[in-house]
Structure formats: C-alpha cells, structure tokens
Amino acid sequence: MAAPTSLKQIDLSPLPGKSYFNCEREWREDFIYFLMTDRFQDSAARVPVTGAARSVGVATGNSFYGGTIRGVTNNLAYIAGLGCTAIWLSPVLEANSYHGYDINNYLDIDPNFGTKQDLVDLVAAAHGFVKDGEPWPIRIIMDVVINHSGDNWGYPGGFPYYYSGGQRFPFGTWHRTDRPLPVELRNPDYYHRCGEMSNYDTSPENQLGDMDSLKDYENDDDEIGSEVINALIMAFCYWIREADVDGFRMDAVKHMGPVACSRFCSNVREYAYALGKRGFFLFGEVASPTDDLYNSYLGPNTSVQVGDETVFFGLNSVLDFRLAEGVYGDANNAPLPTILKGQNGPQGLFNRLNLQLNRALNRGELGRYLVTFVDNHDSFWQPTGRYANGATDAQVIGAIGFILCSLGTPCIYYGTEQGFSGSGGDIQMREAMFDTTNTTSLLNTGCTIYQEIAKIAAVMRAQEPLRFGRMYYREISGDAVNFGMPFGSEYTLALSRMLYSVEVLVAYNVSGAARTDSVIVDATLYAPGSTMTYLYGGTGTVTVQTAASGACFVTLPLAGYQFVVLG
C-alpha cells in the first residue's frame, strides 16, 4: 500500500485488533542507546570482530553509508547485552541527508533506511525481546523534527539569505515539485522566511531564523502557526499509530515557539494515552547553559508566561547539555567530560546538585528525568571530539558508570562502548560500526569497555537506589580524620544514592595514580564494624568505621581510574 501524501489520507483511529505496547517501567529506570541509523549496521550478515581491545570507527564521509532499520533489528541482542532498555533512533523519515534532520517527507521512511514495515518489525521485535530467557522489553524512541524542514525550497536568486532584524523575505522556488510531504506543507506562508540565523542564543533571532539551509517553520501563536503545528502533530501521531513507538526526542526545541511546543506535547501525549500508551516519553534538545531554562520546559504541569498567556511546554525531560557542556570559561561549572578526566575540579557538580535540590523544594522533575550523556553526534559543544578521544578504557568505563549511577536517565552514544574516538567535526564523530568493503562488524561483545559497562548496567538494574534514590556527593579524607568535599584534579569522586533505609555508594578515582581515601556514609544506617559489599569493581567487603566526630566512613583503596559500587 502506497504511503499517504496528504493529511486527508491519514486515519488516526487505532489499528484494528492492535494492542498497543505500554511498558510499566519508569523512564528513569531506562538506559538509552542513541544510534545514527545510517552508521550503526546495514542489513548484511556480518561477523563481529573479537578480542578485548577497543576499535576505531569506520570513516564514512558526508553521504549515506548504508545503515538500515533492519540492521538495528538484527542486532537487538548486542544492544540488550550492553544493558540498554531503550533505543533512540536518529531520524528515519525521508530526508535530504544521511543524518535525517532535514526531512522532506513526514509520511514515509527514507528508502535508504528501509520501509515502514521495517520500522514496524523493529518495534515489535524490541517490545518482545527476550534476554537470558526473561522478557527484556526495549522501548523505541523516534527522533522528530518539528522546528524546521529540510532545504526543500530556496530564496529568490537561489543564494543564501541571512537574518536581518526579523525581516521576512520573499519566497523563491521549491527544489522539487513533489516535496515536501504531506502536500499541506507546500505553503510558503508556513515558513518564517527570515534567512539563516547567526546567533543561536539570542531571541527572537533564534526562533525566527533558519538553521543554516534548514527552513524554519512559522510556529508562532497565530492562525498560521496553529495550522503548521497541527499538521506536524498529525504526521507524527501517524507513526505512533502505525509503528507503536514509545517516545519522541524533539530536535531543536529551544528554537521553537513555546505555544507550538506546548500544543505538540499535549496533543501527542493525549493521543498516546488514547491508544493505551501511558508512558510515552517526550524529551527535547535544549542546548543551554542554564537550568532555569530547562525548568521552564519540564513537566506538563510546569508553566511560563508568554505575554499575557500561561503556557505549559509539556516535555517530560530535556537532554542535559548543562551537565555535559557546562558553562564556557567557568571552572566552577566545568563540562562533565573534563571533570571525569581530571582536567577540572568537581565543584561544578556540587554546585549544580545544590541548585537542583533547592529547586526540588518547589518541583521535583529537574534531575529526575534529565537525559544524561558524555558525548553525542554534534561537534558544536565537543571541541576535543568523542569522550574516548584521549581517554583510557578505564576512563570511558568510569564516565558511563557515573551517568548510570547518578541522577537522570543515562544515554550512551553508539560506539562509545567500543572506544570510538572520532574528533574534528560532526562527520568524524559519526563513524560507522561496519565496513562496506568487508563482512565484519565492530559489534564486539568481548571488548573490555562493552563488558564492563554491561556489568555496571546490571548493578543499576538490580539496585533500586541507583534508579530511584536521592543523591548526595560525599566528603572524603586522606587521613580518615579531616573530611571535606574534594577539589583539584586528583581525588576520589564519591556519591551516595539513598532510598528509604538503603544506601548505595559509588566512587571513582579520577586520577591515573592509585590512591586511598576514606568516604563518608550514612551514620544512621551503619553501626561501627558493619560492612559494605562490593557490587562492582572490587571483591569482598569493607568495614564501616567511626571518626572522632561521630561520622561513619569506609576506606577505599583505588587503582588509577578505578570505578566501584558498594552496597
């Protein structure tokens, strides 16, 4: 059956006889695997490389390389084996480029990636996946783009126009007579037509301008804006109906009109509920150095004022760029990757948690559902490339261990588990996990990094405090007498996750040299002489001791970059 070309051809009633998937697991329990569809795996039968060593990703260039949806389906065991319970697919709808963020057809799958049936099959296989004889349902998240379209039309003369004080330029010509789809989007008034923006953090330019050649939708609070967002709502609800996907990662949310974002989230959430999908997850890309901006986007009950209107953005979560990217030039708010590599002190982590705890007095969402990561597919915030670039295996393991065991919903970028270390730009950090010139793949389950991440993920899955608990950074001491929060570049970074009467202690030596530090634990939970058991990274137990001050502590001898979990 041919794909629809108009919204008038879309039926959003439930598929006859279809029982839609509703996972009871909370999203903060999940471990998300983010993959670039074109770069993960193709549909060929391949033999994974073996051995404990890390791999170098395959260079691919800036065009379609061959990855497919079927390649994901065929390798669900690899993703589940890592401990992941959700997959975030880069955009799979028909687009002008391999990355998919420049959509030209919202109603069909890009033929480079496969077919609608391939997506349906992937979701069904993921929902029904069995690991070690037990159900292991994997959620599938679609990456959706509603702020802008692809480069589907041009300005007069065929050359770039640039933002100039909000001036609206004339429409030029469509690049194709049969795109974009649905046909309703072939309305020049549906686009702001203000030219390419230069300032991505300055309003109103960052909500009116095009992102390079990608054309910005008119998503204002007016009649045209309502028509545009309603069209996009229908288009993406179509994919919930047809494929039973479990969530949307919303691209470039910061550049959308707030009313449009609110309407999209509210309508999509209601539609998912109507199908029985109670836990549909909506998280957005808000590249921002401030938690206050994040705060305004989170939760269907969180509102902001837009003029005389009260607007509820309605996102469940945002990607935690504030943690990963930090604040440029501010050592007290350093990027997480530089902290975990010992290049900056940890004060930024402590400051941020204190701010989050203060905000939680009024609302509890921030930090609960933030999607945390140490690297991804965009180079604009990663001047040194992927996290593994210049990092040892142990440092990569420690970094992913940190996001697995700290607040938030952890997300790993494909290839990190194999030590991919691309740097220099987007293309270099979007390596392939297969080589079209041979029959092997880089899905190596014997790689040390892969295996150790899987072990930590298993601990996270088994220990409820690591999924639901409160979090506190812990004071340390080199002499078991004088305790304080660590500083500098050589220290043990320690945190506790607390859930009712259970504490799980996480510690990571951020330096390459062995060190022994004593770490505070909760004195109300441990009697002197009691023990904590290694859950990961060590064997046996450590004894709880009491300082002269009455504080309880354990002493941890750690090798360089050693990561441990105790409970």
Where are these regions (language model features)?
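A secondary-structure boundary/capping signal
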Residues: M36, L89, A252, Y414-T416
